[in-house]
Each structure stands twice: as C-alpha cells, then as structure tokens.
C-alpha cells in the first residue's frame, strides 16, 4: 500500500458536493488545518472517485478494511490513530477522506499543491484498485438546496456560499405562497417586470425568479440576497460571516 506523510488537511464536513470541498487557494485563515502524520493513498477508477467526491453514501466495505487504522493524525505532539482515513485519486482528481468511524465520507479535504503533485507522481504507473460498490442507476438529483455543479462553476468560495444562502432564502420564500410578496421581490430583482408580474400567479413568478437567479453571480444577486435575509437571524448570521471575509 502507498502512504503519504505530513499531509495538511482542511476538513469540510457533511459535504455531498465536491465543489464545496475547497481547493488550497480558497482556504481561509480561520479554517482549522490539521496534520496527518501518515495516511494511505488509494488509486481507484473514475466512477468510484466521483462517487466518493460527490456523494455521502456508503463506501465499499473492502476499501474500509484496507485503510482501517492505517492513518495517524498529529495533535498536540500526540500521534493519534484514525479509524478510516485515506487519500483517494483516479489520477486526475484527489481528495482526502475521514469517515470519523462511520462508513460514509463524512469529512473531505483537498491537499496542498506540492502534495497533490506528489500523489500524481506516486500513482502514475499504478493500477487502480477494484472495489465493488452499489452505484445508483438514476442520475443524482440536484435541487435548490443542493445545486448542480454547473450552477456553481466559476464562482469563488464566498460567491458559492452566498449563492447557497440566496437559494435557502428563496426556498423559504416558496413556502409562504404569498403572491404579493413574490411580486415585490421579483420587481426588486427586475424593476422593468413590475407590470408583467401583476398578471402572474405565485408559482410562475417564483419559478421565473429562481430560473433567472440561478445563473452566475453578480452585484444584483448579492443585493437580492442581502435584502431577502434581512430580519431573519439565522440567515443574517450566515450573511455576516461571509461578508467578514475579505477574500475568497
């Protein structure tokens, strides 16, 4: 088995979508960075790699057995054995996984560029391990609270977080079924549509607002998000946390 040593990780917990597992250039000063003293490295085929990166589903039992107790984390000068922790690659993408004792990839991290390069070199002439696993035949269903990667492509970490906050606020707005309110918000988004929305029903206006807002990210998106979250403590807190960030 291949091993990496002294690997820096920045765990993102409970993320089913790989786009939320930030690459090194998006790590922040207040992220908690940990040091893996030793961690096994597995090369798998692309189907399994994407399954691990973009799902929160059961990992192959044989894979868990292969990595069991083979990783160590360095904490306060102690070397602590980890239950199921490993780095996995298909030769293109790379991700570190810690199941925190479960059989699903609860925590995920990218590696720093120097260590990514080391992974590519180590697996270049290595055959991918074969692991049996059940992959759902149906395509993964994305929705407003778990957006498709295409909707998030090209955005910074801060923009992705704010876009997801906007979607959460829009989802909550959908539960109100308040036609006057949705007309108001669509007019905030597009003042020229004032006359048009007066003759539309709630569902049609909401669907049109979501359809238009899900493309890209701009000052207009940010303004709508800021206004929608106002007066909602939980959403406001998320807004403030992101706007404390000067970069990313």
Swiss-Prot record:
Pfam families: DUF3603 (PF12227). It comes from the Bacteria. InterPro entries: UPF0736. Belongs to the UPF0736 family. This is UPF0736 protein BCAH187_A1335. It comes from Bacillus cereus (strain AH187).
